[in-house]
Amino acid sequence: MIRYCLTSYREDLVILDIINDSFSIVPDAGSLLKERDKLLKEFPQLSYFFDSEYHIGSVSRNSDTSFLEERWFLPEPDKTLYKCSLFKRFILLLKVFYYSWNIEKKGMAWIFISNKKENRLYSLNEEHLIRKEISNLSIIFHLNIFKSDCLTYSYALKRILNSRNIDAHLVIGVRTQPFYSHSWVEVGGQVINDAPNMRDKLSVIAEI
């Protein structure tokens, strides 16, 4: 399993330690991320991270884009869609409890370990199904008694869509000065539960 995920934001290097569920920032090292020899020559203390299995993510397309740090808001349910039955809501809530409890207790490592690797295809006729599953999840998510944040919501949405044979990916983005991390879901390279230009605002440190 990958131990570290790395990316850069402006001049900063950001490291995600999956096992310890923590982020680290190394100022002025970001520009050397893709030049390993130069990076380790100038920052020899980073050799520890490169001796383990690691992944290098993508850099924000426009780090000058303003990004308002604010509390994450749960997506509003789509009132134009048919609401799922109470039984389905109950089953969905149990899944959310399971995902959020494990994320709260076991951290990022559990997400990587439990990630399913099946290859699935996406077609445009699945857009209605995606909208419906987002709406259904939003209806019950406020009842979650465990960790409720963008990571939990996005991971739950990814797993729900995967179970419907949709190749959804959890994406984790970061920025620095001040530090901020955020999670969203993409299908076919498109953001489905957040602003479409998230990759312009944040550097992607992990895709699951």
Curated annotation (Swiss-Prot):
One of its GO terms (cellular component) is cytoplasm. It comes from Escherichia coli. Signal peptide: none annotated. Along with McjC, necessary and sufficient to process the inactive microcin J25 (McjA) precursor into the active peptide. InterPro entries: McjB-like, McjB_C. It comes from the Bacteria. GO terms for biological process: antibiotic biosynthetic process. It is found in: Cytoplasm. This is Microcin J25-processing protein McjB. Keywords: Antibiotic biosynthesis, Cytoplasm, Plasmid.
